């Protein structure tokens, strides 16, 4: 018998079990999260006798006779303080890590109620946040300490929902207190547990699968193999090359390949059953690198060959340009695979729904899931309903199928609810990564430093399956030359299949890699010309009316020069400083369907927003709320954002390509204008005005009337729906037009990295052209989070493979933690006058792109060693 106190209540429990498992499964506490299972992420942080402890590496035996406290056990005043502070400063994004952060803050305050910033950083060293960059979390803890010292709280959270105001995130409170429900938090009666048996080898012929012993386990429900799939066995986000289950007689392509699916009555039984399945393999030599896979005699990973996709971007006369150039620089660069390391491992819960399936998920696009599940099950799409719960981070890593299709298949076959949640080890092994790339770049200029030619050859390791390797390669090529005037470019790209884990979407979408190479080359060119790295960028930066690398004409909202000017003084005032610029598209573009959609449904005195746009931490729900409030003048509490649901949420596309604020935001603006047109009719009828003749009634008059008659108007319009749709019209990548429109908008950025004489980062200055900041604190948080993610990419992160097998654990990925984060100064540049979504451009990806080359430039200035490989070697952070 084990006895302890949990949140002030005495507990007695006979079985010794993992503390995290007890808290989640027996005590039904949802604030403690299973982020890694190895004591490395801090999402399961609790207080044990008032001191921080990780629940995932403790047992009931270890805490016998002790007191355990979770967020649920805080006093009401403590909950108010933490909720207010974290909301106030914008410290919450995806929210998965936040309860653990709160507990670490509480543990710190138990011993020190007046901590320094360094002491706060040390206190949360064991907590990983992948979204915020820690900056605003540290501010929230500082503010909380101040309030606790004062002993009182003034409730003054921002409730003005207008554009340009830092409205408190609509979901912040639930995430802070741990009441926000992610998929793995869901409990359903009669739930079965599912998992896949994965191959032992990255490349092997599956000769036999024997499930007889496993079927004799008393707690087995079913075991499925490839022959049990009723529909199309091959799935894929774009290319259908990824088998949901590997069949007998088929080769495995990477260690994440699933051989069999098991449904069991308990998690414990699930592990036992998986071990009883016998698979006979013929191990084959894996193709470890693109250079190996591209050999003429290399075995084919897929029937079409090992070259998945090729791209070319060519303009001008590159040969003549090189002949006439004064200075030429050529270098080769290497960037690694990297892991998204979102804090919430993949999870899905599926159940029978009539003659179809209902799937609860936490991904970046419910309609993509619906389509792929319907193909797998051989059912019409209308038979598959997908509902998103809260999503604990994505960064591109939750665009592909991981567990959703397997959960749906099991639930459909056994007619029971089934949950599949990946362990962190499985997550690191299975989902697509950032592409490793080998990039050779030649950059040329005239005697004044004006760019004359840019040549690049990019080889991307797309791993075992296509995922989004094609579009990633395309974006790497179209953005490689940067936001500069250069009339002569020749960029080629090749995506190659290997037996490594698949590579796909990752924040920056290929641009992070190609810009690293291009920007580093530019510094050497400046050196040859005899001008500064800032000056060569300013001389070549595009202005409105200039032609971009892809032929598109830069629009009036182009503000790369403004970002350069914003940090010019910082650049010249510091001795050891690196600089880098970039551009990044908003929207999928290149002639593909790119649509934002929403329905505004008036119900019970509230405007309900229904859209499939996934919030993965970026705060799209808050943005939509502010757009509605801007137009109507209503309070944010009159707006409710629903969870994405294929049953009643219009398809607004995947949360990818930094598109949702612009595309879904514009759809919401259009729908809200339709709503206001109806309000105007109501006003006209009440005031005996002929609406058709008096269509120019001042908007301010209508807004004021609506505010004075809110409940009355909303009741009159009860059950009315107002649909909004925005279609981004663009040209295909191979358009014959001289100046095609590849994307509806581009954001621009310049970042500085400032080092001290020991090579330690002092500050990152990040100036970003965001068009219009709908919510400034939200924009700052995106900048800070993107910067810190790329601090790791530049300096410490890696995803090592041993013969195609991942060998990293969560704790060894090299993720940046709070104590290492330097000062980050976000500078918001607003120039865009476009009506689309009030001029907002996407900010989610571009924040992580220029950081690595800026840091490389700073180290080159420090020691004159020109580093061409990431993570950078021989630095303060990696010797």
Please place each PLM-identified region on the residue numbering.
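Signature of N-terminal electron-transfer/Fe-S-associated modules in redox systems
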Residues: 1-155, 590
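Short beta-strand elements
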Residues: 46, 174, 180, 184, ...
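Glycine-rich loop/linker segments at domain edges
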Residues: 90, 165, 171-177, 307-348, ...
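Flexible, low-hydrophobicity surface segments
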Residues: 145-309, 328, 413
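C-terminal catalytic domains of large/alpha subunits in multi-subunit enzymes
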Residues: 226-227, 378-383, 413-418, 472-582, ...
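Phosphate/diphosphate-binding loops
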Residues: 258, 264-266, 415-463, 665-688, ...
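Conserved beta-alpha junction segments in alpha/beta enzyme cores
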Residues: 318-377, 474, 580-606, 611, ...
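Thiamine diphosphate
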Residues: 390, 394-415, 419-420, 620, ...
């Amino acid at each position: 018998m084990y006895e302890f106190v949990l949140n002030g209540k005495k507990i007695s429990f006979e079985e010794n079990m993992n503390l995290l498992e007890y808290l989640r499964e027996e005590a039904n506490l949802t604030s403690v999260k299973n982020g890694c299972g190895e004591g490395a992420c801090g999402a399961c942080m609790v207080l044990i006798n008032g001191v921080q402890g990780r629940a995932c590496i403790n047992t009931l035996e270890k805490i016998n006779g002790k007191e355990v406290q979770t967020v649920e056990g805080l006093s009401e005043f403590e909950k108010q303080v933490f909720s207010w502070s974290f909301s106030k400063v914008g410290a919450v994004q995806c929210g998965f890590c936040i309860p653990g952060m709160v507990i670490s803050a509480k543990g710190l305050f138990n011993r020190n109620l007046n901590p320094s910033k360094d002491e706060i950083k040390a206190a949360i060293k064991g907590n990983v946040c992948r979204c915020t960059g820690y900056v605003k979390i540290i501010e929230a803890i500082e503010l909380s300490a101040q309030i606790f010292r004062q002993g009182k709280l003034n409730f003054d959270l921002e409730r003005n929902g207008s554009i340009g105001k830092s409205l408190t995130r609509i979901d912040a409170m639930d995430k802070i207190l741990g009441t926000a429900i992610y998929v793995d938090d869901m409990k359903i009666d009669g739930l079965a547990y599912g998992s896949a048996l994965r191959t032992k080898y990255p490349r092997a012929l599956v000769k036999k699968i024997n499930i007889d012993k496993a079927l004799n386990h008393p707690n087995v429900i079913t075991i499925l193999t490839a022959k049990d799939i009723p529909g199309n066995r091959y799935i894929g986000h774009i290319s259908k090359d990824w088998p949901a289950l590997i069949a007998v007689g088929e080769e495995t392509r990477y260690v994440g390949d699933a051989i069999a699916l098991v449904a069991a009555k308990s998690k414990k039984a699930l592990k036992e059953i998986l071990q009883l399945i016998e698979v006979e393999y013929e191990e084959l030599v894996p193709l470890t690198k693109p250079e190996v896979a591209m050999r003429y005699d290399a075995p084919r990973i897929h029937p079409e060959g090992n070259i998945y996709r090729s791209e070319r971007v060519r303009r001008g006369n590159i040969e003549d340009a090189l002949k006439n150039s004064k200075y030429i620089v050529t270098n080769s660069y290497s960037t690694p695979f990297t892991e998204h390391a979102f804090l919430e491992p993949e999870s899905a819960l599926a159940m029978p729904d009539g003659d179809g399936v209902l799937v609860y998920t936490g991904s970046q696009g419910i309609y993509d899931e619906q389509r792929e599940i319907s193909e797998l099950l051989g059912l019409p799409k209308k038979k598959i309903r997908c509902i998103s719960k809260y999503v604990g981070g994505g960064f591109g890593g939750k665009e592909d199928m991981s567990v959703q299709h397997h959960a749906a298949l099991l639930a459909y076959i056994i007619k029971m609810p089934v949950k599949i949640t990946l362990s962190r080890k499985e997550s690191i092994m299975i989902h697509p990564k950032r592409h490793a790339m080998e990039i050779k770049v030649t950059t040329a200029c005239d005697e004044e430093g004006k760019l004359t030619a840019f040549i690049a050859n990019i080889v991307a390791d797309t791993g075992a399956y296509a995922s989004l390797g094609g579009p990633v390669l395309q974006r790497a090529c179209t953005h490689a030359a940067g936001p500069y005037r250069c009339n002569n470019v020749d960029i080629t790209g090749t995506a190659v299949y290997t037996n490594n884990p698949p590579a796909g979407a990752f924040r920056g979408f290929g641009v992070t890699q190609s810009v690293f190479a291009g920007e580093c080359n530019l510094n050497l060119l400046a050196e040859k010309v005899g001008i500064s790295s800032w000056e060569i960028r300013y001389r070549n930066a595009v202005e409105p009316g200039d032609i971009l690398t892809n032929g598109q004409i830069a629009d009036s909202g182009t503000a790369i020069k403004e970002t350069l000017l914003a940090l010019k003084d910082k650049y010249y005032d510091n001795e050891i400083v690196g600089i880098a610029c970039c551009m990044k598209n908003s929207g999928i573009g290149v002639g593909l369907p790119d649509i934002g959609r929403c329905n505004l449904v008036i119900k019970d005195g509230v405007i309900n927003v229904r859209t499939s746009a996934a919030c993965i931490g970026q705060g799209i729900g808050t943005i939509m709320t502010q757009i509605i409030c801007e137009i109507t003048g209503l309070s944010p509490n009159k707006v409710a954002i629903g969870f994405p649901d294929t049953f009643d949420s219009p398809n607004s596309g995947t949360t990818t390509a930094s598109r949702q604020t612009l595309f879904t935001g514009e759809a919401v603006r259009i729908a809200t204008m339709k709503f206001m047109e109806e309000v105007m009719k109501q006003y006209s009828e009440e005031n005996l005005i002929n609406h058709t003749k008096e269509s120019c009634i001042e908007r301010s008059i209508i807004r004021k009337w609506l505010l004075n008659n809110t409940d009355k108007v909303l009741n009159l319009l009860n059950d009315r729906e107002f649909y909004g749709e925005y279609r981004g019209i663009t040209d295909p990548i191979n358009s014959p037009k001289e100046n095609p429109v590849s994307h509806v908008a581009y954001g621009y950025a310049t970042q500085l990295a400032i080092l001290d004489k020991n090579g330690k980062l002092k500050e990152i200055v990040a100036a970003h052209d965001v068009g219009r900041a709908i919510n400034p604190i939200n924009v700052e948080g995106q900048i800070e989070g993107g910067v810190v993610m790329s601090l790791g990419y530049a300096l410490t992160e890696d995803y090592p493979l041993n013969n195609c097998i991942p060998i990293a654990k969560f704790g060894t990925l090299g993720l940046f933690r709070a104590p290492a984060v330097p000062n980050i100064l976000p500078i918001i540049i607003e120039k865009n006058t476009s009506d689309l979504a009030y001029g907002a451009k996407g900010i989610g990806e571009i924040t992580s792109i220029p950081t690595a080359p800026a840091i490389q430039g700073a180290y080159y200035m420090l020691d004159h060693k020109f580093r061409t490989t990431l993570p950078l070697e021989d630095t303060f952070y990696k010797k």
